[in-house]
Amino acid sequence: KIKYEVIAKQIEKTGEAQVSTTDPDSRALLIHGQVVEIAYNTQAAVDDKHKLVVATQTLNRNDRNALYNAVKEVQANLEQTDFTVLADKGYNNAKEIDNTQKAGVTTIVAQQEIVNSNAKGTTPDYLVTKFTYNKENDTYTCPENHTLRSTGTLHTKHRDYSSHKFKKYRTPACKTCPVKHLCTVRVEGREIERGEFAEAMELNTKNYKEQYALYRKRQE
Protein backbone atom coordinates (compact mmCIF):
# COMPACT_ATOMS: atom_id res chain seq x y z
CA LYS A 1 0.00 0.00 0.00
CA ILE A 2 2.80 2.41 0.91
CA LYS A 3 4.45 1.77 -2.47
CA TYR A 4 1.31 2.78 -4.36
CA GLU A 5 0.78 5.82 -2.17
CA VAL A 6 4.30 6.99 -3.05
CA ILE A 7 3.57 6.46 -6.76
CA ALA A 8 0.28 8.35 -6.45
CA LYS A 9 2.07 11.30 -4.86
CA GLN A 10 4.68 11.21 -7.63
CA ILE A 11 1.97 11.35 -10.31
CA GLU A 12 0.22 14.20 -8.51
CA LYS A 13 3.48 16.14 -8.16
CA THR A 14 4.60 15.76 -11.77
CA GLY A 15 1.17 16.13 -13.36
CA GLU A 16 1.85 13.07 -15.51
CA ALA A 17 -0.96 10.64 -16.27
CA GLN A 18 1.23 7.58 -15.64
CA VAL A 19 4.62 6.46 -14.34
CA SER A 20 6.83 3.45 -15.05
CA THR A 21 8.39 1.81 -11.99
CA THR A 22 11.02 -0.07 -14.04
CA ASP A 23 12.07 2.69 -16.46
CA PRO A 24 11.03 6.12 -15.17
CA ASP A 25 11.50 7.81 -18.56
CA SER A 26 9.31 5.38 -20.55
CA ARG A 27 5.52 5.31 -20.85
CA ALA A 28 2.76 2.97 -21.96
CA LEU A 29 2.28 3.83 -25.64
CA LEU A 30 -0.32 2.62 -28.13
CA ILE A 31 1.89 0.95 -30.74
CA HIS A 32 -0.75 -0.17 -33.26
CA GLY A 33 -4.36 -1.27 -33.08
CA GLN A 34 -5.00 -2.05 -29.41
CA VAL A 35 -1.41 -3.09 -28.66
CA VAL A 36 0.14 -1.13 -25.77
CA GLU A 37 3.81 -1.42 -24.81
CA ILE A 38 6.13 0.30 -22.35
CA ALA A 39 8.32 2.14 -24.81
CA TYR A 40 9.76 5.32 -26.28
CA ASN A 41 8.72 7.12 -29.45
CA THR A 42 11.44 8.24 -31.85
CA GLN A 43 10.80 11.19 -34.16
CA ALA A 44 12.84 12.15 -37.23
CA ALA A 45 12.43 15.10 -39.60
CA VAL A 46 13.92 14.75 -43.09
CA ASP A 47 14.76 17.53 -45.54
CA ASP A 48 13.06 16.87 -48.88
CA LYS A 49 15.74 18.44 -51.07
CA HIS A 50 18.83 16.68 -49.72
CA LYS A 51 17.15 13.66 -48.05
CA LEU A 52 19.02 14.36 -44.81
CA VAL A 53 17.76 13.98 -41.24
CA VAL A 54 17.56 17.50 -39.84
CA ALA A 55 16.05 16.79 -36.41
CA THR A 56 15.51 13.83 -34.10
CA GLN A 57 13.69 13.37 -30.82
CA THR A 58 13.04 10.51 -28.43
CA LEU A 59 9.77 10.97 -26.56
CA ASN A 60 7.61 9.08 -24.10
CA ARG A 61 4.42 10.29 -25.74
CA ASN A 62 2.70 9.45 -28.99
CA ASP A 63 2.83 11.35 -32.29
CA ARG A 64 -0.17 13.55 -31.47
CA ASN A 65 1.92 15.75 -29.19
CA ALA A 66 5.18 15.71 -31.15
CA LEU A 67 4.75 18.04 -34.14
CA TYR A 68 5.49 21.47 -32.68
CA ASN A 69 8.60 20.44 -30.74
CA ALA A 70 9.99 18.71 -33.82
CA VAL A 71 9.36 21.84 -35.90
CA LYS A 72 11.13 24.04 -33.32
CA GLU A 73 14.16 21.76 -33.45
CA VAL A 74 14.22 21.92 -37.26
CA GLN A 75 14.04 25.72 -37.13
CA ALA A 76 16.94 25.84 -34.68
CA ASN A 77 19.09 23.39 -36.63
CA LEU A 78 18.50 24.98 -40.03
CA GLU A 79 18.30 28.55 -38.75
CA GLN A 80 15.21 28.90 -40.92
CA THR A 81 11.65 29.60 -39.82
CA ASP A 82 9.56 29.52 -42.98
CA PHE A 83 9.14 26.09 -44.52
CA THR A 84 6.43 23.49 -45.10
CA VAL A 85 6.03 20.46 -42.87
CA LEU A 86 4.41 17.25 -44.13
CA ALA A 87 3.10 14.79 -41.54
CA ASP A 88 0.74 11.82 -41.45
CA LYS A 89 -2.59 11.79 -39.63
CA GLY A 90 -1.00 10.58 -36.41
CA TYR A 91 0.22 14.15 -35.93
CA ASN A 92 -3.20 15.71 -36.53
CA ASN A 93 -3.58 17.61 -33.27
CA ALA A 94 -5.31 21.01 -33.36
CA LYS A 95 -3.14 22.68 -30.72
CA GLU A 96 0.09 21.35 -32.25
CA ILE A 97 -0.96 22.52 -35.73
CA ASP A 98 -1.96 25.94 -34.38
CA ASN A 99 1.38 26.40 -32.60
CA THR A 100 3.26 25.28 -35.70
CA GLN A 101 1.46 27.76 -37.95
CA LYS A 102 2.04 30.57 -35.45
CA ALA A 103 5.75 29.73 -35.65
CA GLY A 104 5.62 30.65 -39.35
CA VAL A 105 5.50 27.12 -40.75
CA THR A 106 3.01 25.93 -43.38
CA THR A 107 1.32 22.70 -42.26
CA ILE A 108 0.17 19.88 -44.50
CA VAL A 109 -0.93 17.23 -42.02
CA ALA A 110 -3.13 14.39 -43.22
CA GLN A 111 -6.72 14.50 -42.05
CA GLN A 112 -8.23 12.14 -39.53
CA GLU A 113 -11.37 10.33 -40.55
CA ILE A 114 -14.39 12.57 -40.02
CA VAL A 115 -15.63 12.21 -36.46
CA ASN A 116 -19.05 13.71 -35.87
CA SER A 117 -20.54 14.07 -32.38
CA ASN A 118 -23.93 13.08 -33.80
CA ALA A 119 -22.65 10.46 -36.23
CA LYS A 120 -25.41 8.00 -35.33
CA GLY A 121 -28.32 8.87 -37.56
CA THR A 122 -26.35 11.40 -39.62
CA THR A 123 -26.41 10.83 -43.37
CA PRO A 124 -23.55 11.98 -45.65
CA ASP A 125 -25.42 15.10 -46.79
CA TYR A 126 -25.55 16.36 -43.19
CA LEU A 127 -22.04 15.66 -41.93
CA VAL A 128 -20.38 18.52 -40.09
CA THR A 129 -18.35 19.31 -43.23
CA LYS A 130 -21.61 20.29 -44.94
CA PHE A 131 -22.19 23.09 -42.42
CA THR A 132 -20.76 26.52 -43.26
CA TYR A 133 -19.06 28.60 -40.59
CA ASN A 134 -19.71 32.35 -40.73
CA LYS A 135 -16.77 34.12 -39.12
CA GLU A 136 -18.40 37.57 -39.21
CA ASN A 137 -21.13 36.69 -36.71
CA ASP A 138 -19.77 33.43 -35.26
CA THR A 139 -22.59 31.19 -36.50
CA TYR A 140 -23.02 28.08 -38.62
CA THR A 141 -25.44 27.63 -41.51
CA CYS A 142 -26.79 24.12 -41.99
CA PRO A 143 -27.60 22.47 -45.36
CA GLU A 144 -31.24 23.52 -44.87
CA ASN A 145 -30.15 27.16 -44.47
CA HIS A 146 -30.92 27.38 -40.75
CA THR A 147 -28.57 29.34 -38.47
CA LEU A 148 -26.90 27.65 -35.52
CA ARG A 149 -25.74 29.95 -32.73
CA SER A 150 -23.59 29.58 -29.64
CA THR A 151 -24.25 30.96 -26.17
CA GLY A 152 -20.56 31.81 -26.03
CA THR A 153 -19.89 29.34 -23.23
CA LEU A 154 -16.51 27.62 -23.49
CA HIS A 155 -16.45 23.91 -22.68
CA THR A 156 -13.31 21.85 -22.08
CA LYS A 157 -12.26 18.45 -23.42
CA HIS A 158 -9.30 16.46 -22.14
CA ARG A 159 -7.31 14.00 -24.23
CA ASP A 160 -3.94 12.37 -23.61
CA TYR A 161 -1.74 15.04 -22.02
CA SER A 162 -3.62 18.06 -23.31
CA SER A 163 -6.98 19.77 -23.29
CA HIS A 164 -8.80 22.23 -25.52
CA LYS A 165 -11.78 24.53 -25.30
CA PHE A 166 -14.74 24.62 -27.66
CA LYS A 167 -18.17 26.17 -28.15
CA LYS A 168 -21.45 24.45 -29.02
CA TYR A 169 -23.80 25.68 -31.74
CA ARG A 170 -27.52 24.86 -31.93
CA THR A 171 -30.73 26.08 -33.57
CA PRO A 172 -34.37 25.78 -32.42
CA ALA A 173 -35.28 25.17 -36.08
CA CYS A 174 -34.31 21.52 -35.58
CA LYS A 175 -37.51 20.84 -33.67
CA THR A 176 -39.69 21.37 -36.73
CA CYS A 177 -37.21 20.52 -39.48
CA PRO A 178 -38.70 17.89 -41.86
CA VAL A 179 -35.29 16.28 -42.49
CA LYS A 180 -34.12 16.17 -38.88
CA HIS A 181 -34.05 12.37 -39.01
CA LEU A 182 -31.37 12.59 -41.71
CA CYS A 183 -29.25 14.95 -39.62
CA THR A 184 -29.38 13.73 -36.03
CA VAL A 185 -31.13 11.41 -33.58
CA ARG A 186 -30.73 13.88 -30.71
CA VAL A 187 -34.11 14.90 -29.36
CA GLU A 188 -32.82 18.43 -28.76
CA GLY A 189 -31.61 18.73 -32.35
CA ARG A 190 -28.24 18.99 -34.05
CA GLU A 191 -25.22 20.27 -32.16
CA ILE A 192 -21.97 21.44 -33.76
CA GLU A 193 -18.75 21.87 -31.81
CA ARG A 194 -16.09 24.40 -32.79
CA GLY A 195 -12.71 24.20 -31.07
CA GLU A 196 -10.46 27.11 -30.16
CA PHE A 197 -7.99 26.05 -32.85
CA ALA A 198 -10.59 25.58 -35.59
CA GLU A 199 -9.11 28.25 -37.89
CA ALA A 200 -5.72 26.56 -37.85
CA MET A 201 -7.33 23.21 -38.63
CA GLU A 202 -9.34 24.71 -41.49
CA LEU A 203 -6.20 26.24 -42.99
CA ASN A 204 -4.38 22.91 -42.67
CA THR A 205 -7.28 21.11 -44.37
CA LYS A 206 -7.18 23.67 -47.19
CA ASN A 207 -3.43 23.15 -47.60
CA TYR A 208 -3.85 19.37 -47.58
CA LYS A 209 -6.53 19.39 -50.27
CA GLU A 210 -4.86 21.98 -52.50
CA GLN A 211 -1.37 20.49 -52.19
CA TYR A 212 -2.15 16.80 -51.95
CA ALA A 213 0.43 16.00 -54.64
CA LEU A 214 3.08 17.60 -52.42
CA TYR A 215 1.87 15.63 -49.41
CA ARG A 216 2.25 12.39 -51.35
CA LYS A 217 5.99 13.08 -51.58
CA ARG A 218 6.41 12.08 -47.94
CA GLN A 219 5.35 8.57 -48.94
CA GLU A 220 8.03 8.24 -51.61
List PLM regions with ranges.
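Anion-binding and metal-coordination hotspots
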Residues: 1-220
